[in-house]
């Protein structure tokens, strides 16, 4: 593993973490909470609790090796014996699942941008113009993904510019929401009615609760990436940075949910979206408050934020499979660099995986939801979050394994006991939510839909691709071992 020079002070990295986690993931999923009426607050605090537990876990395990990159994969190598097949399988799956989470999130950005511009007159309700918007948005993000394979990177000044635009839009969203609430303040009463939604009786099932939980968890995702950056930070207390950043993000989200709770939300109805003060998406907030000009301001701001992240996404994610290839869990061709020092094979593999996944998760939800951009964005958020939550469970088990091996993770026994209880609670709740999300029919009320099949198929296929590559390397590994065995002499 490469050893890095320190690039961030504590304060710089604290701002970096808050900016990395808090953002459009929150405003693209926050309104989905109000499908559950007053239970939205229960889900918000439950998601925040699990996020805090995850933060504590990553903060604890990040102290294992502060000087090398690798993240959860590196920790799994230290916790398990790579000479045993079952342990190698766990180590590989930890690294591979971390890789495939990014392609599963790939459709969110284009869907989110399209949902921002769909409110322009002449688009919504017009099939031809809708398809033009879809084609333009998808092609644009396809081009961004291609450009990101060229090693494009953003310097600190440019990142600061994009961050400034992003936060200007985020804060404007809260201010504009207050203006809309002032015009029509019925949202607080309707959104907190357990029985009646905006237009019909609420249908709250365990499947619906799990879906909203996992969808909203997207707004807190990022700890798995941040924890791999310990070599870049000049600090002796990485744990403090993560906890302070969580508190900052939580407070921002709490204020945001408190404000959004006053909006007349129509997430349960397909009729009259965006009319008469009824809010189906954040784009509707701007359109109702300031018309086309405000809507364009929001759309352009969201676009700038997405461009800044998408330009480096392929390169960043390709780095996740490098250690797997270097350790012979994946074909070594992925670890080969060209004359310019770029790992082109890993980059193009990541590009192909991302584009195929983005295409499927972009078009299928749109078509099956009758081109409901908001619902499609929420679905795209949920499937990526599901893979991320699986990653968190793997990290919890890594910590349990390290404790079993009596690794020096804790200085005080009470801290170890308390965190073990919290991590156990985290595993239980995440497993429960994943179970009802992946198999919602087990609650006896939710009907199986095409999107449920799509989730299992897409995630399952990506896992099978990884296992096929892993088994190929295992076969080569065993063949190589056999070649080293000296044959017995014939007498």
Curated annotation (Swiss-Prot):
Localization in the cell: Cell membrane
Membrane topology listed for this record: Multi-pass membrane protein
Gene3D superfamilies the record matches: Amino acid/polyamine transporter I
Keywords: Cell membrane, Membrane, Transmembrane, Transmembrane helix
Transmembrane segments: 13-33, 39-59, 89-109, 127-147, 161-181, 203-223, 241-261, 288-308, 347-367, 380-400, 422-442, 452-472
InterPro entries found in the cross-reference section: AA/rel_permease1, APC_superfamily
GO molecular-function terms, A-Z: transmembrane transporter activity
GO cellular component: plasma membrane
Main location: membrane
Family named by the database record: To M.genitalium MG226.
Protein name, per record: Uncharacterized protein MG225 homolog
Native species: Mycoplasma pneumoniae (strain ATCC 29342 / M129 / Subtype 1) (Mycoplasmoides pneumoniae)
């Amino acid at each position: 593993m490469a050893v890095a020079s320190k690039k961030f002070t504590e304060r710089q990295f604290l701002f970096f973490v808050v900016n990395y986690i808090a953002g459009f993931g929150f405003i693209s999923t926050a309104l989905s909470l109000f499908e559950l009426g007053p239970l939205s607050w229960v889900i918000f605090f439950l998601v925040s609790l699990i996020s805090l537990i995850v933060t504590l876990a990553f903060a604890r395990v990040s102290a294992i090796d502060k000087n090398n990159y690798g993240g959860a994969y590196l920790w799994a190598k230290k916790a398990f014996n790579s000479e045993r097949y079952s342990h190698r399988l766990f180590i590989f799956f930890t690294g591979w699942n971390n890789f495939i989470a990014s392609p599963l999130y790939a459709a969110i950005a284009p869907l989110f941008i399209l949902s921002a511009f769909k409110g322009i007159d002449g688009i919504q309700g017009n099939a031809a113009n809708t398809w033009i918007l879809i084609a333009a948005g998808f092609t644009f993000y396809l081009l961004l993904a291609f450009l990101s394979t060229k090693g494009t990177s953003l310097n600190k000044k440019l990142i600061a510019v994009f961050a400034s635009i992003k936060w200007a839009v985020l804060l404007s969203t809260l201010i504009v929401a207050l203006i809309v609430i002032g015009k029509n303040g019925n949202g607080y009463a309707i959104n907190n009615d357990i029985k009646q939604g905006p237009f019909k009786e609420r249908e709250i099932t365990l499947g619906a609760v799990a879906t909203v939980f996992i969808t909203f968890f997207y707004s807190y995702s990022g700890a798995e990436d941040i924890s791999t950056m310990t070599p870049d930070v000049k600090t002796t207390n990485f744990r403090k940075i993560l906890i302070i950043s969580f508190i900052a993000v939580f407070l921002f989200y709490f204020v945001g949910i408190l404000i959004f709770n006053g909006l007349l939300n129509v997430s349960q109805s397909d009729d009259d979206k965006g009319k008469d003060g009824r809010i189906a998406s954040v784009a509707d907030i701007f359109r109702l408050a300031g018309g086309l000009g405000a809507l364009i301001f929001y759309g352009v701001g969201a676009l700038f934020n997405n461009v800044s992240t998408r330009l480096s996404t392929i390169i960043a994610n390709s780095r996740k499979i490098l250690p797997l290839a270097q350790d012979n869990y994946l074909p070594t061709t992925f670890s080969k660099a060209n004359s310019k020092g770029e790992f082109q094979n890993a980059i193009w593999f990541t590009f192909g995986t991302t584009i195929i996944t983005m295409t499927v998760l972009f078009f299928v939800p749109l078509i099956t939801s009758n081109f409901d951009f908001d619902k499609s964005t929420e679905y795209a958020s949920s499937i990526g979050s599901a893979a991320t939550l699986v990653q968190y469970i793997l990290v919890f088990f890594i910590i349990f394994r390290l404790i079993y091996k009596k690794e020096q993770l804790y200085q005080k026994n009470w801290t170890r006991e308390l965190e073990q209880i919290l991590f156990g609670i985290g595993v239980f709740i995440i497993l429960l939510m994943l179970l009802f999300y992946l198999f919602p029919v087990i609650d006896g009320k939710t009907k199986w839909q095409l999107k449920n099949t799509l989730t299992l198929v897409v995630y399952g296929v990506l896992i099978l691709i990884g296992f096929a590559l892993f088994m190929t390397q295992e076969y080569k590994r065993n063949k190589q071992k056999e070649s080293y065995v000296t044959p017995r002499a014939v007498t």
